[in-house]
């Protein structure tokens, strides 16, 4: 678990994952500083914390396909957004992760 996630004391349940979207540059290519309202949500996010795991019909915990520290691709509308100490995070289900970026 990353230091950042440890200080948050957030433990997602089931097959949910706590991620932090990558920050978009606040300056456009031409050097213009963009206001927050002009920025778009990033599709890339870093995996910070894994949930307790999804269970199969026999009660066995299924392994996650992602690991802490992975950079993943998620839909810009995926998950539940939350703000803790001024930092924005998203809790998504593993099925909302479209790819792991290498």
Swiss-Prot record:
GO biological process, one term: chaperone cofactor-dependent protein refolding
GO molecular function, one term: ATP binding
Alphabetical list of SMART domains matching this protein: Cpn10 (SM00883)
Organism: Chlamydia caviae (strain ATCC VR-813 / DSM 19441 / 03DC25 / GPIC)
Subunit architecture: Heptamer of 7 subunits arranged in a ring. Interacts with the chaperonin GroEL.
InterPro entries: Chaperonin_GroES, Chaperonin_GroES_sf, Chaprnonin_Cpn10_CS, GroES-like_sf
Its biological purpose: Together with the chaperonin GroEL, plays an essential role in assisting protein folding. The GroEL-GroES system forms a nano-cage that allows encapsulation of the non-native substrate proteins and provides a physical environment optimized to promote and accelerate protein folding. GroES binds to the apical surface of the GroEL ring, thereby capping the opening of the GroEL channel.
Pfam families: Cpn10 (PF00166)
Gene3D superfamilies (alphabetical): GroES chaperonin
Protein name per the record: Co-chaperonin GroES
PROSITE patterns, per the entry: CHAPERONINS_CPN10
Main location: cytoplasm
Assigned keywords, A-Z: Chaperone, Cytoplasm
Subcellular location: Cytoplasm
GO CC annotation terms, alphabetical: cytoplasm
Family the entry assigns: Belongs to the GroES chaperonin family.
């Amino acid at each position: 678990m990353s230091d950042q996630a440890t200080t948050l004391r957030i433990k997602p349940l089931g097959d949910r994952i706590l991620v932090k979207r990558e920050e978009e540059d606040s300056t456009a290519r031409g050097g213009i500083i963009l206001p927050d309202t002009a920025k778009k949500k990033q599709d890339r996010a870093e995996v910070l914390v894994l949930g307790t795991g999804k269970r199969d019909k026999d009660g066995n915990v299924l392994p996650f396909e992602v690991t802490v520290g992975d950079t993943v691709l998620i839909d810009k509308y995926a998950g539940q957004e939350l703000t803790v100490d001024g930092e924005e995070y998203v809790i998504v289900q593993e099925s909302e992760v479209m790819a792991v970026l290498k």
